[in-house]
């Protein structure tokens, strides 16, 4: 058995390859490309790899999977707690990972499937859009609150200016030219983001239709489609608990 520790960065990784006795077979920096990785591991048989969980570490996990290499995803903080080092270098970090894998001390985290990660990205993008839209709404409310008494009185005719009735009132406001441009820009931005939210809502609905677990969760009072899909995606496999 061969053990490969990967200290992963956005553009490159430092890889240390240990044999079953713990001797270093090879160590070096490799660009995060399949061809370079294949060249580095040429001749290796019965390989197990380990990489710390990170924002882009799954790109390496997928490449290794395509090469037929099973990869363990390690918990970064727990790795640090187990194997403290006074001097940190890429080489030492990759060796540390390979050594912990060989000795059976890797603190492992749940490794998500490609499909699950894609579903996560859908949900996170929707959350991103909703957050941006909330910022735009707050900015528009603040801008309207800074207008004269007559404008504020018109706006106060509705509880929510983001309803159809509220938007009609905004269009009819007798704002100074510069203020009207500011309000108009925010309204257009609000509608643009709403279109993006609607698009991602459709993707969430597709996920819901494909997920029996999400449909089951949605039967619980208080769970809508988005929350049901979110819980199902985060759990992924109930058997891991």
Q: What are the roles of these predicted feature ranges?
A:
Residues 72-124, 158-166:
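Short alpha-helix plus adjacent loop in nuclease-associated cores
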Residues 2-18, 97:
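Gly/Thr-rich phosphate-binding beta-strand-loop-beta motif of the actin/hexokinase/Hsp70
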Residues 12-34:
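Short glycine-rich, Thr/Ser-proximal phosphate-binding strand/loop in the N-terminal lobe
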Residues 124-216:
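Glycine-rich, often acidic, oxyanion-interacting loops/wings at catalytic, nucleic-acid
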Residues 229-239:
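Catalytic palm subdomain of template-directed nucleic-acid polymerases
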Residues 47-56:
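Short glycine-rich phosphate-binding loop at a beta-alpha junction
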Residues 32-48:
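Short, basic/hydrophobic alpha-helical segments
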